[in-house]
From Swiss-Prot:
Keywords, alphabetical: DNA-binding, Repressor, Transcription, Transcription regulation
Source species of the chain: Escherichia coli O157:H7
GO terms classed as biological process: negative regulation of DNA-templated transcription
Domain of life assignment: Bacteria
Domain HTH tetR-type, first and last residues per copy: 17-77
PROSITE patterns the record matches: HTH_TETR_2 (PS50977)
Self-association and partners: Homodimer.
Record's function text: Master transcription regulator which represses the degradation of pyrimidines (rutABCDEFG) and purines (gcl operon) for maintenance of metabolic balance between pyrimidines and purines. It also regulates the synthesis of pyrimidine nucleotides and arginine from glutamine (carAB) and the supply of glutamate (gadABWX).
The protein, known as: HTH-type transcriptional regulator RutR
Gene for this chain: rutR
Length: 212
């Protein structure tokens, strides 16, 4: 392949990647506002600045696009948990995980709300992911946390319930953002409130799992 051909291929690849990113971003905005059934592909295409035909070239159906958006959300959420290793200091690792999950709630509130909508609907389009890769990851990390408990590095708690509690307390600030703002007058976009939230959620959870 000539140097010119390589440059052309690289340019085309970047253009495709940018177009997919624009479509996924527009899909997240639209699905989180109108839900799966209330969203039309024409809306997403217009917001992404592409034709419907072009959109369908990359994502063959509304369902395929919706699932791609949800998988992207899961990848963002689960990355910090995937990084857990047995040699980590447990309390420090869990404190950092809480901070990272709150950063996700701050930076991707629409993603959190869309995922919540899918769960409330019974996860009809995401159940394979939940019972497959997600369950495998939770099983793996629960066993790791159970090892920390057994070695006395954490109080005797159930690992799955710990993970659920972290998810619930951190995602609340995105899923119920209007309620949080109505009560406190602030959102996670407020730096002072964000830091207070991190410190309080960390303290409440860490003090509950600290070995006595």
């Amino acid at each position: 392949m000539t140097q010119g051909a390589v440059k052309t291929t690289g340019k085309r690849s970047r253009a495709v990647s940018a177009k997919k990113k624009a479509i996924l971003s527009a899909a997240l905005d639209t699905f989180s506002q109108f839900g799966f059934h209330g969203t039309r592909l024409e809306q997403i295409a217009e917001l992404a600045g592409v034709s419907k035909t072009n959109l369908l070239y990359y994502f063959p159906s509304k369902e395929a696009l919706y699932i791609a958006v949800l998988r992207q959300i899961l990848d963002i959420w689960l990355a910090p948990l995937k990084a857990f290793r047995e040699d980590f200091a447990p309390l420090a690792a869990i404190k950092e995980y809480i901070r990272l999950k709150l950063e996700v709630s701050r930076d991707y509130p629409q993603a959190s709300r869309l995922f919540c909508m899918e769960m409330l609907a019974g996860a009809p389009l995401l159940m394979d992911e939940l019972t497959g890769d997600l369950k495998s990851l939770i099983d793996e990390k629960s066993a790791l946390i159970a090892g920390w408990v057994k070695s006395g590095k954490l109080a005797p708690i159930d690992p799955q319930h710990l993970i659920f509690m972290i998810w619930a307390s951190t995602q609340h600030y995105a899923d119920f953002a209007p309620q949080v703002e109505a009560v406190t007058g602030a959102t996670l976009r407020d730096e002072v409130f964000f830091n207070q939230t991190v410190e309080n959620v960390q303290r409440i959870i860490i003090e509950g799992i600290r070995p006595r």
